[in-house]
Amino acid sequence: MATITKLDIIEYLSDKYHLSKQDTKNVVENFLEEIRLSLESGQDVKLSGFGNFELRDKSSRPGRNPKTGDVVAVSARRVVTFKPGQKLRARVEKTK
């Protein structure tokens, strides 16, 4: 299974909509930047028909160094999670 990169998306959209690669790159970069800025400011991002990017606070916990087995403290942190929407889940499920 191949991985789709940002460059692949830019090239696909540029070809499909007959836009310059630079214009398409600007649109994709600005779209992703808006998502980043929203998450940085503490807002969840909901993309209808696709899914939600949500912020979750994880508490500190004890962890283990896999090489040495020593117990180490894993500090509290905020993480971004992605929860696919129903439409996306249904379409992915159909491809099995």
Swiss-Prot record:
Identify the keywords attached in UniProt to this record, alphabetized.
Answer: DNA recombination, DNA-binding, Transcription, Transcription regulation, Translation regulation
Look up keyword DNA repair and say if it applies. no
One example GO MF annotation: DNA binding
| Biological process, per Gene Ontology | DNA recombination; positive regulation of metabolic process; regulation of DNA-templated transcription; regulation of translation
Tell me a GO cellular component.
cytosol
- The stretch of residues making up the signal peptide is none
Coiled-coil annotated spans: none
The source's superkingdom equals: Bacteria
List, alphabetically, the CDD domains matched.
IHF_A
Report the Pfam families cross-referenced here: Bac_DNA_binding (PF00216)
Q: Does the keyword Transcription regulation apply?
A: yes
Subunit-structure text: Heterodimer of an alpha and a beta chain.
PANTHER family noted in UniProt: DNA-BINDING PROTEIN HU, INTEGRATION HOST FACTOR SUBUNIT ALPHA
Q: Family, per the entry?
A: Belongs to the bacterial histone-like protein family.
Its annotated function is as follows: This protein is one of the two subunits of integration host factor, a specific DNA-binding protein that functions in genetic recombination as well as in transcriptional and translational control.
What name does this protein carry? Integration host factor subunit alpha
